[in-house]
């Protein structure tokens, strides 16, 4: 909303001020502080009224039309802000910074910050157990760069890659609360599903501009020291992100002290389909129930919970780091320290985000008490882990640190239970500052004086009901009933008339009022100044405090994984350099927790001689569960966790792929089969011999022969060319012949027992192929009408009889043509129809076979 000077003159001074500030943030809801309310005007008011369900009123007129207005009380604003942020809205906060008592004209106001979904740091507006990331994406030719910033911790990370599939996977992993993109971005289909995306001018992504703003932030000459200088596309994204942060926060960002380049080679790569199908932190319905994180996350600090979820979404390949985590978990179990460590960690809470608010100068009084609590508990934590081997806890102890001087400072400066905000004072402890104590004592002395004045005036006037009081609107007053107003002394000056009472002021009381209000104002101003100075004293320790928060979060995660290992009967997997995945009595970490019946543990053995398991068995027999549990155990091993098994040896794994289940992608116009084939293509293009691949029912979305052909060819490609560790579940029993031609393939099956029309699933993995799929029995269990099931049985018998002549599908399984074409089939059938088998001699029968062979 941009108005000319002439147009502004048509408004009141207050509205002129509003419109001038609003012109700075035309596309953002402006919360304009007026006394005890935040007001919104014009279109902002209409929008807020609709989104928040608050009343839409009017204030004055402009151009002959009433000005729409809506407002919320300042003391409950956070609840409204949280709702708007959850809807993806951005809010600009305009505060009164002038003193109404001394202001001539409108009180001075200033735009202090802009809150967007990706830049929130306020405790009340955040999910404390989930990262809140601002991301930026940029494309240059065939390369993509992505930058992510967690403003609540200062983690600033970039990555650069070349495929849209990787971009899709990264966006799903990061799950940004807000994403920035350049005006000419070509792949809108990959980002438009996100709730909050913001188009930014192309020039903000220029490399020179980006390097300049990044060097300014880190006070460096170049970025070589961070090891990011070659990731130029990612740096473009990072520069635009940092510019956006500076535009919205309008303050320095001292906790942004470095930038880190992530490399895919350091991680076990998970594509978007794999993250979704394995239900790591979100189930298929979008909730948290029955996910891996729900089972593993019993952390006691919010920052620990966030770190664990990052580990789950980004398993690592660094053997030394994984061994350290495993050994630390093992030691915590052996020393029985889990419960002892959990209690102080729980009291420490979320110091990571407290430190970020400290850096942004938005820390509240209770944030300082949380820091004080953390400082007081650090010695206890270090004492608890003092007996652990130095090679395990030496680095942790160093990063955790001790802060006796800061603890003493906060103990002297801040009262035990301060108010939520500093606005009304009452935060700084008595004895911390002599001048503050003097002003406070002067203000406190008012109570004694008022009691003495009331007693004296009652005696002087003879009015026994006379009272001396105070309110924020009218100040101090002497109150009498209206019936006694005719006997008040002449020097009483009427200040306010109420229904049954009269209120007066006298010169002595007015003098006292001026003195008290002056002392209160001076005390409050001094207290706010001391509070800012307190933050200034803490800021030089910012980098060390960030290291402390990271160390505490890691200790919480490792301690949590130790507790989970004991409680859930997990074992330490052996991570080996040799190829292979061998797990004895493995269990699905989630299903075993929610199942009402005992979970059936199963083994898996994959090595150079067993590269692929062809898995057959009944519907509902547990094939998908078995496959997922293998992937989840491998993933858990690569975050350093113990796993649900009796014993395990796991070799190098670079990627995990899953092709399990599919549904129509209506938004992109893709059918179930197209989704299935897209995921399959991704696997066939990107899997390596160290990848773990889960393929479930490939080819089921098309005709039988097409599906069988595709499944056959995919299995052959994975086994012979790619040689990935593969679990290949199928209902095409023809595929069970593949191991006869490819020795690295092995048949396994999940069995079931039939009794009459009933079926019992054993859920146990056995060597060899299954003999049937029990589809009709499962249909009956699902409640399909009996007459339909009965009819299906009859049809099945007919099909089985009719399919006998085509049982040669597996004779030449690796050839392109698996059966006669239509013309050849008709000729063969005609030839056979004209033959009487009883009249054939052995020689004629042999000649007939050769003839059919020639026409095949």
Swiss-Prot record:
Against SMART domains, the record matches this protein to: MUTSac, MUTSd
A Pfam entry, by short name:
MutS_II
The answer to whether UniProt assigns keyword Transmembrane helix to this entry is no
- Keywords from the named record: ATP-binding, DNA damage, DNA repair, DNA-binding, Nucleotide-binding
Kindly list the GO molecular function terms attached to this UniProt entry. ATP binding; ATP-dependent DNA damage sensor activity; damaged DNA binding; mismatched DNA binding
> InterPro entries under this entry?
DNA_mismatch_repair_MutS, DNA_mismatch_repair_MutS-lik_N, DNA_mismatch_repair_MutS/MSH, DNA_mismatch_repair_MutS_C, DNA_mismatch_repair_MutS_clamp, DNA_mismatch_repair_MutS_core, DNA_mismatch_repair_MutS_N, DNA_mismatch_repair_MutS_sf
Recorded GO CC terms = cytosol
Transmembrane residues, as ranges?
Answer: none
> What Gene3D superfamilies does the database record attribute to this sequence?
1.10.1420.10, 6.10.140.430, DNA repair protein MutS, domain I, MutS, connector domain, P-loop containing nucleotide triphosphate hydrolases
Intrachain S-S bonds: none
List of residues binding ATP: 617-624
Name a single GO biological process: mismatch repair
**What the protein does?**
This protein is involved in the repair of mismatches in DNA. It is possible that it carries out the mismatch recognition step. This protein has a weak ATPase activity.
Which NCBIfam families does this chain map to? mutS1 (TIGR01070), PRK05399.1 (NF003810)
Name the HAMAP family on file. MutS
Entry similarity comment: Belongs to the DNA mismatch repair MutS family.
Q: What is this protein called?
A: DNA mismatch repair protein MutS
Species for this entry: Psychromonas ingrahamii (strain DSM 17664 / CCUG 51855 / 37)
Q: What is the lineage of its organism?
A: Bacteria, Pseudomonadati, Pseudomonadota, Gammaproteobacteria, Alteromonadales
């Amino acid at each position: 909303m941009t108005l000319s000077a002439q147009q502004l003159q048509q408004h009141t001074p207050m509205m002129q001020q509003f419109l001038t500030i609003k012109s700075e943030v035309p596309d953002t809801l402006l919360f304009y502080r007026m006394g005890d309310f935040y007001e919104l005007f014009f279109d902002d008011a209409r929008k807020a009224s609709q989104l928040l369900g608050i009343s839409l009123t009017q204030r004055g007129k402009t151009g002959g039309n009433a000005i729409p207005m809506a407002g919320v009380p300042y003391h409950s604003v956070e609840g409204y802000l949280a709702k708007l942020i959850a809807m993806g809205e951005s809010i600009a906060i305009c505060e009164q910074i002038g003193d109404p008592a001394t202001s001539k004209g409108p009180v001075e106001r200033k735009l202090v910050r802009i809150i967007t979904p990706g830049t929130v740091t306020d405790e009340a507006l955040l999910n404390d157990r989930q990262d809140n990331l601002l991301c930026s994406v940029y494309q240059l030719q065939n390369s993509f760069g992505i930058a992510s910033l967690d403003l609540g911790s200062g983690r600033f990370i970039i990555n650069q890659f070349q495929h849209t599939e990787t971009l899709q996977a990264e966006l799903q992993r990061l799950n940004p609360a807000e994403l920035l993109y350049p005006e000419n971005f070509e792949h809108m289909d990959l980002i438009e599903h996100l709730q909050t995306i913001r188009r930014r001018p192309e020039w903000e992504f220029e490399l020179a501009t980006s390097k300049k703003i990044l060097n300014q932030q880190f006070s460096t000459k170049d970025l070589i020291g961070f090891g990011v200088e070659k990731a130029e596309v990612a740096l473009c994204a990072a520069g635009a992100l940092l510019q956006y942060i500076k535009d919205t926060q309008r303050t320095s960002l001292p906790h942004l002290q470095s930038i880190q380049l992530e490399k895919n080679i350091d991680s076990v790569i998970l594509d978007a389909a794999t993250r979704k199908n394995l239900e790591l932190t979100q189930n298929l319905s979008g909730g948290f129930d029955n996910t891996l994180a729900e089972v593993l996350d019993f952390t006691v600090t919010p920052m620990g919970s966030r770190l664990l979820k990052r580990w789950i979404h980004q398993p690592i390949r660094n053997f030394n780091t994984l061994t350290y985590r495993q050994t630390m978990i093992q030691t915590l179990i052996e020393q029985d320290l889990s419960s002892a460590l959990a209690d102080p960690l729980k009291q420490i809470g979320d110091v990571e985000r407290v430190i970020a608010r400290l850096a942004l100068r938005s820390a509240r009084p209770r944030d300082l008490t949380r820091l004080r609590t953390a400082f007081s508990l650090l010695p206890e934590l270090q004492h608890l882990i003092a007996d652990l081997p130095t090679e395990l806890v030496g680095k942790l102890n160093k990063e955790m640190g001790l802060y006796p001087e800061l603890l003493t400072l906060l103990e002297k400066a801040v009262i035990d239970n301060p108010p939520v905000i500093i606005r009304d004072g009452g935060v700084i402890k008595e004895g911390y500052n002599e001048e503050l104590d003097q002003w406070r004592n002067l203000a406190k002395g008012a109570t004694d004086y008022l009691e003495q004045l009331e007693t004296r005036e009652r005696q002087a006037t003879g009015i026994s009901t006379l009272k001396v009081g105070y309110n924020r609107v009218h100040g101090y007053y002497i109150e009498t009933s209206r019936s006694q107003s005719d006997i008040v002394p002449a020097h009483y000056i009427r200040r306010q008339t109420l229904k049954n009472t009269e209120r007066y002021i006298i010169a002595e009381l007015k003098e006292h009022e001026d003195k008290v209000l002056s002392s209160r104002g001076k005390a409050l101003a001094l207290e706010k100044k001391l509070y800012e100075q307190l933050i200034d004293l803490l800021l030089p320790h910012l980098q060390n405090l960030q290291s402390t928060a990271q160390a505490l979060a890691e200790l919480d995660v490792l301690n949590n994984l130790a507790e989970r290992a004991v409680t859930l009967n997990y074992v330490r997997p052996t991570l080996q350099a040799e190829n292979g995945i061998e797990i004895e009595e493995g269990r699905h970490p989630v299903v075993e927790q929610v199942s009402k019946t005992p979970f059936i543990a199963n083994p898996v053995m994959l090595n150079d001689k067993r590269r692929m398991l062809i898995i057959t068995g009944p519907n509902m027999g547990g094939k998908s569960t078995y496959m997922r549990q293998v992937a989840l155990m491998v993933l858990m091993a690569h975050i350093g966790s113990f796993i649900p098994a009796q014993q395990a040896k796991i070799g190098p794994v670079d990627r995990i792929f899953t092709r399990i289940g599919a549904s129509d992608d209506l938004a992109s116009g893709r059918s179930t089969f197209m989704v299935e084939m897209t995921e399959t293509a991704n696997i066939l293009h990107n899997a390596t011999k160290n990848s773990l691949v889960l393929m479930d029912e490939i080819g089921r979305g098309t005709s039988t022969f097409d599906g069988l052909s595709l499944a056959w060819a995919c299995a052959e490609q994975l086994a012979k060319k790619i040689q990935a560790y593969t679990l290949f579940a199928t209902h095409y029993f023809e595929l069970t012949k593949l191991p006869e031609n490819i020795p690295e393939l092995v048949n396994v099956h999940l069995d079931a027992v039939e009794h009459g029309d009933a079926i019992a699933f054993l859920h146990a993995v056995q060597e060899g192929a299954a003999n049937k799929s029990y589809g009709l029995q499962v249909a009956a269990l699902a409640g399909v009408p009996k007459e339909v099931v009965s009819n299906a049985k009859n049809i099945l018998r007919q099909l089985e009889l009719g399919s006998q002549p085509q049982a040669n599908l597996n004779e030449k399984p690796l050839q392109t043509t698996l059966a006669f074409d239509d013309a050849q089939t008709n000729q063969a059938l005609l030839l056979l129809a004209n033959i009487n088998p009883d009249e054939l001699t052995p020689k004629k029968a042999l000649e007939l076979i050769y003839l059919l062979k020639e026409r095949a």
